[in-house]
Amino acid sequence: MLFRSGKIINILDTPGHKDLAEDTYRTLTAVDSVILVVDAAKGVEEQTERLMQVCRMRSTPVIIFINKLDRQGKDPFELLDELEDKLDISVHPLTWPINMGSSFKGVYNLQEQNVRLYTPGKTRVEDDDDLLIVSDLADEILDIKLDSDAGKLREDIELIEGVYDDFSADDYLAGITAPVFFGSALNNFGVFELLTTFTGIAPSPGKRETDTRIVEPHEEQFSGFVFKIHANLDPRHRDRIAFLRVCSGRFEKDKPFLHTRSKKDRRFSTPYTFMASRKSIVSEAYPGDVVGLYDRGDLKIGDSLT
């Protein structure tokens, strides 16, 4: 995913169901940061606690998105307490919901000090769409647009600013603090604020530890590992795709790479990159990129190429 800032973010979506937990854990080995999605009504579920334990073990920084604010859910302050209690991490809200359910009005951005108004059923949100710029929380435009919810918003923000210190990106990177965002993923609402912050604070592709040494992303020699294998990804064909995370150097289409387990060279003429259900052939890939490789059964999870 290419952002206007020129940064490329590779997002790996994983299932939240506990029956598919193993697939999620494997994917966590290939990422440098994590976005945990929490249901506003259900709160922190058992599977979320387990995922957080893995993130803590791997020192992976975490951002939390509290979802489904367009439905009735738990009180936002109650959710923050639950996150800290069950996930054992300090949290810091960077956006704040204005009511919820059928009365959901939008979110207040504590960093930018603006309000994004919510329009039910609208799924396309631009960076300046429905954005309400306010001079401060005393701005009368809040009373005009939010009606009685303006007073509650002022009280909530005053409480938040009194409880929480300034947000520290260093604490986020160290896994000490998790920034929290609110919204509705189904309506693509509140996601822009999350991703804008994510591109500013998330770590670049990091080093990877192997059995013999630590691989740095700036090394010229190519290296990568298989973290997932998916069979029959295309229902029209009997295919088998191995997903490879590039750790260092440059992956190139048709170039021979050593499969370290078999000690044999492998070439890949149709390496793919994926965007949801769409896929396209790529000629090269760099550290942090994920490439799909057609596999005849020779590759296994954990295999390395160099």
Go through the PLM ranges and name each one.
Residues 1-306:
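Structural and coupling elements of P-loop NTPases
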